[in-house]
Regions:
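Hydrophobic, glycine- and aromatic-enriched re-entrant/interface helices and adjoining loop segments
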Residues: 1-64, 86-90
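A juxtamembrane structural motif centered on a specific transmembrane helix
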Residues: 108-158
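Hydrophobic alpha-helical segments of membrane proteins
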Residues: 29, 62-69, 101-110
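Loop-to-helix entry and N-terminal half of a specific, functionally important transmembrane alpha helix
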Residues: 81-120
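Hydrophobic alpha-helical transmembrane segments
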Residues: 58-78, 93-94, 134
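Transmembrane helix-bundle signature of multi-pass membrane transporters/permeases
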Residues: 54-57, 97-101, 129-132
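Structural signal for the C-terminal ends of transmembrane alpha-helices
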Residues: 72-83, 143-150
């Protein structure tokens, strides 16, 4: 990952094409389904770990910042629930899920932009993949359940 140009047709191919696609998106992107790197098969398996590259090429910097802001909102909701939770389990669970989402997002974005090696970390709730998506949805459901149980006990005691 430090020098993908050394093996541009082998191990560095995916990362080089990812950087080209991210850079070609510019500020506003090329438009929905108009990405040349993505749809001319220069970037293989774009729907999996490199979905952020596809978003960057088609929707540009504005689209990528919108996705990042949505993730920050979701992570901040997890931390807000941990602060408001009455039970220690709900607090620990919410902090853990929020931290896990934060690490996944940072690692995926760093991976597709060349700051970290490509290791196969999906972008939560966006990348194609069954087991990772299922695990993330279940963990968010547990956080929402912890928040709901805290509110139900408040209503019951009132």
């Amino acid at each position: 990952f430090l020098n993908p140009e050394a093996d541009a047709l082998g191990r560095g191919y995916q990362l080089i094409q990812s950087k080209i696609a991210l850079g070609s998106g510019g500020l506003t992107g090329k438009g929905f389904l108009e990405g040349s790197q993505s749809y001319l098969q220069y970037l293989p398996e774009k729907q999996t770990d490199f979905i952020f590259t596809l978003i960057g090429e088609e929707f540009g910097f504005i689209g990528t910042m919108f996705i990042i802001l949505l993730f920050l909102l979701l992570i901040s909701v997890c931390f807000y629930i941990s602060i408001k939770s009455n039970h220690i389990f709900g607090r620990i669970l919410s902090i853990g899920v929020g931290s896990n989402l934060f690490i996944y997002v940072i690692m995926n974005i760093s991976m597709v932009s060349g700051l970290m090696p490509v290791v196969g970390i999906p972008l939560p709730l966006v990348s194609y993949g069954g087991s990772a998506m299922l695990a993330i949805i279940i963990s968010i459901g547990l956080v929402l359940n912890a928040e709901l149980n805290g509110n139900l006990k408040k209503l019951h005691n009132a």
